[in-house]
A protein has these predicted regions:
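Extended interaction regions within the primary functional domain
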Residues: 5, 21, 71-72, 83, ...
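PLP-dependent enzyme catalytic core of the Aspartate aminotransferase-like
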Residues: 95-150
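Active-site C-terminal subdomain of aminotransferase-like
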Residues: 1-70
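Short alpha-helical "patches" and their helix-cap loops
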Residues: 26-32, 80, 134-138
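Generic non-transmembrane alpha-helical segments
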Residues: 37, 41-45, 74-82, 120-122, ...
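Conserved PLP-binding catalytic core of the aspartate aminotransferase-like
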Residues: 48-113
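Intrinsically disordered or highly flexible coil/loop and linker segments, enriched in small
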Residues: 26, 44-48, 85-88, 129-132, ...
Length: 150
């Protein structure tokens, strides 16, 4: 039973079902592996990541960056300055505030571990107002790699 649905939620659900039929279990495993890999790398950069256990961050495509409201607002707005959209949340699940990252799209790009390293570094630099030049360089590199995969 679904209530208070929005058209975009239904579209996402339908797309997910189509993807499941077409790509199935392999895609799911890749998506979850990438989520855990990214979470581990972000944790090494000092991000506070929600965990299931010492070694497992998620059993889905989502990872949750736990932050204060002030940190969440700052990080979200910093990312927007670079045309990077993040999913800002203010819920108890996040201990009130945080950022949700999904890895479904990354799984489609077939990125390698070094690309996930770059993504983690990019998010760290954005959150900590790193070098503008370095942020733009990493962002461009990841976009270029994504465009080559199409």
């Amino acid at each position: 039973y679904l209530r208070d649905i929005q058209p975009n939620h239904m579209a996402c659900l339908l797309l997910s079902l189509i993807e499941q039929i077409e790509y199935g279990v392999e895609y799911q495993h890749t998506t979850i592996a990438l989520a855990n890999m990214l979470a581990k790398k972000l944790e090494k950069y000092g991000f506070n990541i929600a965990k299931i256990s010492d070694e497992v961050y998620t059993m889905t495509h989502q990872i949750f960056l736990l932050m204060t409201k002030k940190e969440t607002d700052f990080f979200y707005n910093q990312a927007l300055d670079y045309n990077i959209s993040l999913n800002q949340k203010h819920k108890k699940l996040f201990s009130e505030d945080g950022i949700r990252l999904g890895t479904q799209q990354i799984a489609r790009y077939n990125w390698e571990e070094q690309d996930i390293d770059e993504l983690a570094k990019l998010l760290f630099l954005i959150k900590h107002k790193g070098s503008l030049n370095e942020i733009k360089t990493i962002r461009k590199k990841l976009i270029d790699k994504r465009m080559k995969k199409k």
